[in-house]
Structures are given as structure tokens and as C-alpha cells.
């Protein structure tokens, strides 16, 4: 349920509204606007009569939210969320942020070389995988902590904030200390213990869409993170699996306007997983 107040509602009245609903066992989020304020209620609101809420002279409107996601819902938060990472803003009307770097971190020298190249090319962030989710158990699984430290050294040399994928709760402390944006990959989007865990982190979370997940399922994964207290979530469209075999994945660009309509969260696009080869990616 969403409650909008009239312009000029006093703070004492806002506090009274919050106390009233919290005493009914609901979670209340207050979003302050320029002209009015919005309350987002999460919990069982079926017993709350709209006419009783509207009886308050300071209440302008009451809306019931049918979508299963609440905190990520644009109705709860009309203004775009802007995530600030070391002074670089992502979302809203901010300039487009570019994240680039090696798929896998392969050593200090190589990582530093890549960092300098992507910075020269205009990138704002250095991304690199220290822990790699692989389809085959025989493929390179990443350098682990050594790779994270290589990224840190590259950040010190170039000033680029780093983005890297977290695959296991056991590494949360390491990522909290060293990584600027923590990525949850496509394969772990619905590994809900991980979104729950990063909801307690103090770093922005980059949440990739799963290989075969609907937009609603994707947003619900973000809801897990936000329900844990971390509202700095960035969504990433990276392509989904379809009947098409000429490409690795089908990049669903139509998801971008849908996400911007349904949620207030920033969204970025990863074009690297669609083309079938590196040469095709270069051509794109």
C-alpha cells in the first residue's frame, strides 16, 4: 500500500502516521518529495480500510500495490535512485557510466595493463572476475583472493573503482573490504541466500538478470537485497536464453524501458554475452 500526503504535512503528523502503522506490524518507508511525501507500507495491509486512512486530512491518496515487489517499485519511490560510487553517479540523469575490463583476472601485470587501457578508452570502472562461475569444473575458476588484490593494485594505479563478482557468502568480508561494486551474477540471481546476504553489505550491488528469468523474477531478486537493508542496487541486463542458436544469448534491450517504468533502480546493459565470438563483439 502507498499513501501520499498533501503538500505541507507537518513532521509531527508524518511521525504519527508512521507510529500508527508500525504498531499494526507493518514496515513503513517514508520517501520525501519536493512537494509531497509518500509512505510505502510492506506487510499484510488487507485489514486496513482505505476510507479510514483517507479520513486523515493530511492524506491525499491511497493506492494498493498488486505487484509482488514493493521496495523496488516505482510507486513506492517515484524518483530515480542514483547510486554514488566514489563520486561517480549511476542512474537518473547522470552521464552513462562505463564498466570495462578482463573477464578473468589473470595476474597483476595483465590487470594493470587492462586497467590503463580501459581508462584511456573512457571507462569509469574496472571490472574483473577473481572468482569465476564456470559451466565445466575443469575450466579456470579464477585466482580468488590473489585476483582481488591484483584489482586493488590496479585501482591504486589508475583511480578506477572496481567491480567483481561474489559467488559465496564466505567471501563477503573480503569483498566488503576491497571491492567497490559487488556483482551477483546471472547464475546466482535466484540463489536467494546470496541476495539475502548482500542485503546486509554496505557496498552497491550489481544484480545481473538470470539466463532464463522473467523481468518480475529479476526485480524480486532485487527485492531480497533491498529487504535486507541495502537499497543501492543496480540492475544489469546481459541477455537471456532463447530458441536462437546463432548467438550465445539474446540481449533483451526491451527490458530497459520496462525496468525504468516499473522500478526506480538504475539499469545498465552488458553486451558481451550476446555475440557468439570476440570478433562479433568487436564488430558490434
Question: Predicted segments — roles?
Answer:
Residues 94-96, 122-124, 156-162, 178-180, ...:
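Short, well-ordered coil/turn segments that N-cap beta-strands
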Residues 8, 95-113, 137-141, 161-165, ...:
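Active-site mouth loops of central-metabolism enzymes
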Residues 140-164, 197-204, 253-268:
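Alpha-helix-loop-beta-strand connector modules within alpha/beta enzyme cores
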Residues 6, 143, 159-170, 180-192, ...:
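Catalytic beta/alpha-barrel core
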Amino acid at each position: 500500500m502507498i499513501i501520499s500526503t498533501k503538500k505541507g504535512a507537518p513532521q509531527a503528523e508524518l511521525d504519527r502516521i508512521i507510529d500508527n502503522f508500525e504498531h499494526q506490524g507493518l514496515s513503513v518507508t517514508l520517501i520525501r518529495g519536493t512537494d509531497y511525501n509518500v509512505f510505502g507500507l510492506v506487510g499484510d495491509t488487507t485489514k486496513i480500510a482505505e476510507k479510514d486512512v483517507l479520513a486523515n486530512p493530511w492524506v491525499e491518496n491511497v493506492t494498493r500495490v498488486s505487484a509482488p515487489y514493493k521496495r523496488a517499485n516505482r510507486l513506492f519511490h517515484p524518483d530515480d535512485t542514483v547510486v554514488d560510487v566514489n563520486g561517480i553517479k549511476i542512474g537518473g540523469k547522470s552521464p552513462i557510466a562505463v564498466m570495462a575490463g578482463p573477464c578473468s583476472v589473470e595476474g597483476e601485470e595483465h590487470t594493470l595493463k587492462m586497467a590503463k587501457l580501459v581508462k584511456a578508452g573512457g571507462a569509469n570502472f574496472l571490472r574483473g572476475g577473481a572468482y569465476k562461475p564456470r559451466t565445466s569444473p575443469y575450466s579456470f575458476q579464477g585466482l580468488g583472493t590473489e585476483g582481488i588484490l591484483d584489482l586493488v593494485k590496479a585501482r591504486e594505479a589508475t583511480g578506477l573503482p572496481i567491480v567483481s563478482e561474489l559467488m559465496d557468502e564466505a567471501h563477503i568480508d573480503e569483498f566488503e573490504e576491497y571491492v567497490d561494486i559487488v556483482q551477483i551474477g546471472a547464475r546466482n540471481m535466484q540463489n536467494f541466500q546470496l541476495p539475502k546476504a548482500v542485503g546486509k553489505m554496505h557496498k552497491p550491488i550489481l544484480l545481473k538478470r538470470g539466463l532464463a528469468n522473467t523481468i518480475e523474477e529479476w526485480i524480486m531478486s532485487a527485492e531480497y537485497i533491498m529487504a535486507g537493508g541495502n537499497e543501492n542496487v543496480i540492475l544489469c541486463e546481459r541477455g537471456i536464453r532463447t530458441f536462437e542458436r546463432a548467438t550465445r544469448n539474446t540481449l533483451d534491450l526491451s527490458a530497459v524501458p520496462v525496468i525504468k517504468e516499473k522500478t526506480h533502480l538504475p539499469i545498465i546493459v552488458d553486451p558481451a554475452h550476446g555475440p557468439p565470438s570476440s570478433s562479433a563483439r568487436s564488430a558490434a
